[in-house]
């Protein structure tokens, strides 16, 4: 649910979401099933008068998430972990003149944990409440030739993880001949490894054990990943109306990069396998390009390719799930106002690690369509894996063959 009310100079936005994911692991796994329950509430105000000398935005969010089963303890009475995040964000922008402005942005996350977080017999706690604070001041210039964004990310953490980190927040674009752009950027910042991000990386992943024999069966929260730098140089051009191409190359450095790998253990009667979240410092060099064409918003075509070369300091096996090359192609057709049709192809080849099983490359040809039946009511459908290929989104878990998804969307 997402509702926005527009005032003269302000937008008020209220939104809420609920999610439930209940699924089984593959045969032979240490756990046989998992259940994720999530919900969130959002309320914010957005100042929309761009001519005002002083503008502001503010929002607050309440996010809740429960992981029902954790680390090889499915048969224990209660191993659920509950995560509550109180997220507050705001920024204030002051205009220097029509082309220049200065902004100070703040974001605070309060993490609260309950459930299977503490060893009752020893008192050791493996999921501690903590707070993160981001300070992001920046200067912006926007004129006919230059677009500059110069700032810094100052990340503080209280109660868990490294206390102080700093990364750049810089983007520069030079525009010439109206449709040619040379750009450079150096960005970074904290990537919160909350339960939602764990699910997005691998829903079948188990949290890391606390590593002490006296605490066997208890798990711990991963450190937050920090993007120390993601620097890119690129060139964009539009030599013909509706046509754009973009070539780029860059370097990314990640501290405590979150990944996962396959492990196994021998039980009394059989061998059990599981996927375990792990972390290491990684970096990667990347180059790529993309081209797009749009004809009067009726037909649009786009293609993109990126190649990456990864390196891990100590845990090279974690790179086996990383993308080595990514290619995509998309065709969008909008023949009438009510109908949208998409045909897309995605190919993702994973990094090859010596002595470790290579994941089958993602090879997905899919088609989708949406149609506005009435005002605010639309019907949609998607069909994936039209080629009926065998590949893996997650290590050891083959993707479905030819599959279909459809539904209704309401907007009021």
Where in the sequence are the language-model features?
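Short loop/turn motifs that connect adjacent beta-strands in outer-membrane beta-barrel proteins
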Residues: 5-11, 48-55, 95-101, 142-145, ...
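Amphipathic alpha-helical scaffolding segments
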Residues: 18, 62, 78, 108-110, ...
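Surface-exposed extracellular loop regions of Gram-negative outer-membrane beta-barrel proteins
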Residues: 1, 105-112, 116, 126-157, ...
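Exposed, low-structure sequence patches enriched in small/polar residues
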Residues: 147-149, 153-412
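Outer-membrane beta-barrel transmembrane domain signature
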Residues: 89, 95-97, 109-136, 334, ...
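Flexible loop and strand-edge segments within Gram-negative outer membrane beta-barrel domains
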Residues: 2-87, 115, 121, 125
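Phosphate/ribose-recognition catalytic cores of enzymes acting on nucleotide-derived substrates
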Residues: 45, 62-68, 80-84, 91-103, ...
């Amino acid at each position: 649910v997402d509702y926005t009310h527009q005032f003269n100079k302000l937008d008020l936005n209220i939104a809420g979401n609920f999610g439930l994911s209940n699924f089984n692991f593959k045969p032979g796994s240490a756990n046989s099933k998992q259940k994720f329950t999530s919900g969130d509430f959002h309320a914010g105000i957005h100042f929309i008068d761009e001519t005002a000398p002083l503008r502001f935005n503010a929002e607050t969010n309440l996010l809740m998430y429960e992981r029902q089963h954790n680390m090889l303890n499915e048969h224990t009475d209660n191993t659920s972990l509950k995560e509550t995040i109180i997220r507050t964000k705001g920024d204030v922008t002051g205009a220097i003149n029509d082309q220049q402005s200065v902004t100070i942005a703040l974001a605070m996350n309060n993490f609260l944990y309950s459930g299977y977080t503490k060893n009752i017999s020893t008192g050791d706690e493996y999921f501690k409440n903590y707070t993160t604070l981001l300070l992001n001041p920046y200067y912006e210039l926007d004129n006919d030739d230059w677009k500059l964004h110069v700032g810094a990310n100052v990340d503080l953490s209280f109660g868990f993880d490294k206390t102080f980190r700093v990364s750049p927040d810089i983007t520069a674009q030079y525009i010439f001949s109206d449709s040619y752009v040379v750009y450079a950027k150096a960005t970074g910042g904290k990537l919160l490894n909350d339960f939602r991000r764990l699910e997005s990386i691998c829903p079948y992943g188990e949290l890391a054990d606390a590593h002490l024999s006296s605490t066997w069966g208890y798990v711990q929260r991963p450190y937050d990943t920090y993007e120390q730098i993601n620097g890119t140089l690129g060139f964009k051009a539009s030599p013909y109306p509706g046509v754009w191409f973009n070539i780029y190359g860059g370097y990314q450095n990640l501290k405590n990069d979150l990944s996962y790998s396959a492990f196994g253990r021998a039980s009394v009667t059989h061998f059990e396998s599981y996927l375990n979240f792990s972390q290491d410092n990684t970096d990667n060099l990347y180059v790529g390009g993309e081209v797009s064409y749009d004809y009067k918003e009726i037909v649009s075509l786009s293609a993109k390719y990126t190649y990456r070369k990864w390196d891990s300091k100590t845990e090279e096996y974690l790179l086996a799930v990383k993308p080595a090359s990514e290619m995509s192609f998309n065709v969008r057709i909008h023949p009438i106002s009510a109908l949208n049709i998409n045909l897309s192809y995605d190919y993702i080849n994973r990094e090859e690690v010596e002595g470790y099983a290579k994941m089958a490359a993602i090879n997905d040809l899919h088609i989708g369509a949406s149609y506005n039946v009435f005002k605010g009511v639309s019907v949609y459908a998607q069909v994936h894996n039209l080629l009926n290929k065998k590949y893996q989104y997650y290590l050891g878990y083959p993707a479905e063959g030819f599959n279909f998804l459809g539904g209704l969307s309401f907007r009021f």
